[in-house]
């Protein structure tokens, strides 16, 4: 492979090769490859981002060997995504991509912190990020259960709770958003999103993705007059396997401690298994203060290291 590496903005002509590139990266560190062309389009054309300024493609010998892009996440954070092909490590590509992202982030939001995510299995990432001034701030694990381990027992709901699907009750969309805000208030890393942002991120940006938006899999716990809990599920179907994912689960504070969280998890498992999932996963912050880890383990899930979130603060002179 040539030592000459060109870095240029991403374009729509890169969609298919970028898809193949990212699948090669995730296959090494996760054992799966499920990026789709729609995922790449969503990355390049994320709302508010300019591919000519906010994406970087590293090319050597006509092949993509690195990719990075960044976007504003609220007024105080810029998120970065950067990957180097497993066979192109050790050539400084990752450092160049991160430097370009940092420079662009400083132009975009000079006072904002920068965050990025790395897979725990990527042993080379920590040294690179620390050299670039990043520090680890949060660790996540992926909880997993095989479909064969899901309990056959019917879900037992707390008194007065009815489970409904968003697809059957679209009129509850606003109530779901209100419950989501209440359930995640104060949680680390949660930005207060407007209702429009909530739906853009979870519905519109999912069109054509490996884990598409399916309102039939959005399960709501309904008490008289309000949504008090929710479990937003997704299903990825491929030739290799079908993976169910609990993307978000929450219970409003006033309803915690009564078994509603366990009922939602159990019901989601049964629902995803019934849709053909061979295994079910969800990601959880190891510092979660709502006893989430214990809840998922009590439901039969097994934890394994997943990813780390890194942060870089702007230079002090920028703040003055």
For the regions a language model picked out, list residue spans one by one.
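Hydrophobic adenine-recognition pocket in adenosine-nucleotide-binding enzymes
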Residues: 10, 84, 249-251
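Conserved donor-binding loop and adjoining core beta-sheet/short helix segment
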Residues: 22-119, 223, 228-242
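Phosphate-binding active sites in nucleotide-utilizing proteins
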Residues: 183-242, 246-249, 253, 262
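Active-site/acyl-donor-binding loops of N-acyltransferases
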Residues: 131-151, 217, 266, 275-320
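Conserved hydrophobic/aromatic pocket- or pore-lining residues that grip, position, or stack substrates
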Residues: 176, 221, 268
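Acyl-donor-binding surface of acyltransferase catalytic domains
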Residues: 72-79, 84-162, 167-168, 308-312
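Short amphipathic alpha-helix that is part of the acyltransferase structural core
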Residues: 1-43, 155-197
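Conserved acetyl-CoA-binding loop-helix of GNAT-fold acetyltransferases
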Residues: 90-104, 248-251, 257-274, 279, ...
């Amino acid at each position: 492979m040539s030592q000459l590496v060109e870095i240029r903005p991403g374009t729509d002509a890169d969609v298919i090769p970028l898809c193949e590139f990212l699948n090669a990266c995730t296959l090494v560190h996760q054992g799966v490859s499920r990026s789709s062309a729609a995922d790449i389009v969503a990355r390049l054309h994320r709302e508010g981002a300019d591919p000519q300024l906010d994406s970087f493609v590293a090319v050597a010998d006509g092949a993509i060997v690195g990719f990075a892009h960044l976007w504003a996440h609220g007024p105080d954070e810029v998120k970065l995504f950067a990957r180097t092909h497993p066979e192109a490590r050790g050539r400084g590509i990752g450092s160049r991509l991160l430097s370009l992202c940092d420079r662009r982030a400083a132009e975009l939001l000079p006072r904002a912190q920068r965050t990025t995510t790395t897979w725990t299995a990527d042993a080379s990432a920590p040294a690179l990020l620390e050299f670039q001034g990043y520090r680890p701030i949060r660790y996540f694990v992926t909880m997993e259960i095989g479909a064969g381990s899901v309990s056959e027992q019917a879900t037992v709901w707390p008194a007065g709770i009815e489970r409904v699907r968003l697809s059957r009750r679209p009129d509850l969309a606003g109530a779901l958003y209100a419950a989501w805000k209440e359930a995640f208030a104060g949680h680390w890393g949660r930005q207060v999103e407007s209702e429009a942002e909530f739906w853009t991120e979870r519905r519109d940006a999912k069109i054509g993705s490996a884990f598409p938006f399916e309102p039939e899999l959005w399960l709501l716990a309904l008490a008289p007059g309000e949504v008090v809990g929710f479990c937003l599920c997704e299903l990825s179907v491929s030739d290799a396997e079908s993976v169910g994912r609990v993307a978000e689960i929450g219970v409003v504070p006033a309803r915690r401690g009564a078994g509603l969280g366990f009922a939602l998890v159990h019901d989601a498992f049964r629902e995803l298994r019934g849709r053909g999932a061979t295994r079910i996963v969800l990601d959880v912050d190891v510092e979660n203060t709502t006893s989430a880890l214990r809840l998922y383990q009590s439901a039969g899930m097994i934890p394994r290291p997943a990813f780390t979130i890194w942060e870089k603060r702007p230079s002090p002179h920028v703040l003055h």
